[in-house]
Amino acid sequence: MSQKANYTKINSKMWDEWASAGGEWSLAINHQDFADATQGIFDIYLTPCKPVPHNWFIPFKKAKILGLASGGGQQCPVFAAQHAEVTVFDYSDKQLELEKMVSAREGYSIDLVKGDMSKTFPFKDETFHMIFNPVSNCYIQDVEHVWQECFRVLKKGGVLLSGFANPALYLFGEDEKELQAVHKLPYDGTKSSIENDEELIKNGGVQFSHSLETQIGGQLKAGFTLQALYEDHHHKGKITEYMPCYLATKSIK
C-alpha cells in the first residue's frame, strides 16, 4: 500500500533511484568542465535544454547562493568554481552524495543540507543573495509555500532563478505516438489510482501540475518582482513537438 500522506519521502526515494541509475539530472560535472567554469566558461540549466543566460546571474564571488532541490553535482559546483559560498538543500541522499563527491575531487567547501522544501526552510531570514531552483516543484503540493520561504531567506535585492513545468504537460498521457488528454488540471498525484509505492516510483513519483497562477502569480504574491522569463522544450517526447514544456523565471526580492 502507498503512504501518499508522506509523498515527499516517496519522491526522495525516487530521486535516489534515479541518481543511482545515472539519470540526466544526476550526471555530475567532470573535472574539465569545472576547470572551464573557473574561467567563466559554463552553461547551467534550470530546464532541460536551454541554458540560463549569463546576464541573469549576480556576481558570484563571495555571494551566498542556495541550490534549492539542486543536488546532483551539476549546477552548484559551477557557483563554487566562481568562488561563491554555496549551500545545497535537497531531500535525496544520492543527489547530495554527488555534490560531496565533486567538492572533494575539486577541493572546495560546500554546505550540504538534507531537507524537505515542503516544510519551513532551515535557514534564517535574509541569508542568501541568490536561489537557484531547477525544475523540482512538481514534486511539492503547495508551491506557494516554496515561494514564500524563498522570499523569506533571500536578502533584499536577492535573485530567485526557478525552472518549472508547463502545467499543460500534465494534461496528456504517456503515449509517445499519439497525444491524448487524460487528466483534468490541476493534476494532483496524491489522487493517483496507483497504490503501491514502488509502482509510483517507477512512474515518476507523486507529481503536481500546479498552475501559472500559483507558479508566476505565487511568486508575485510572495512579494517578488518578475524580471525575465523564457520557455524551453524537452529533448524527447511527442508533446515537445507541439509546445514548450518548461518555463524559467528570474525574480527579484
Cite the ranges covered by each PLM segment:
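Conserved alpha-helix/loop element of class I SAM-dependent methyltransferases that forms part
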Residues: 28-63
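A short acidic, Gly/Pro-enriched loop at the edge of an enzyme's catalytic core
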Residues: 118-131
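A short glycine-rich, Lys/Arg-flanked "PGG" loop and its adjoining helix->strand segment in the class I
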Residues: 144-159
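Conserved class I S-adenosyl-L-methionine
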Residues: 159-193
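Short alpha-helix
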Residues: 206-229
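Core SAM-dependent methyltransferase catalytic element
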Residues: 222-224, 238-253
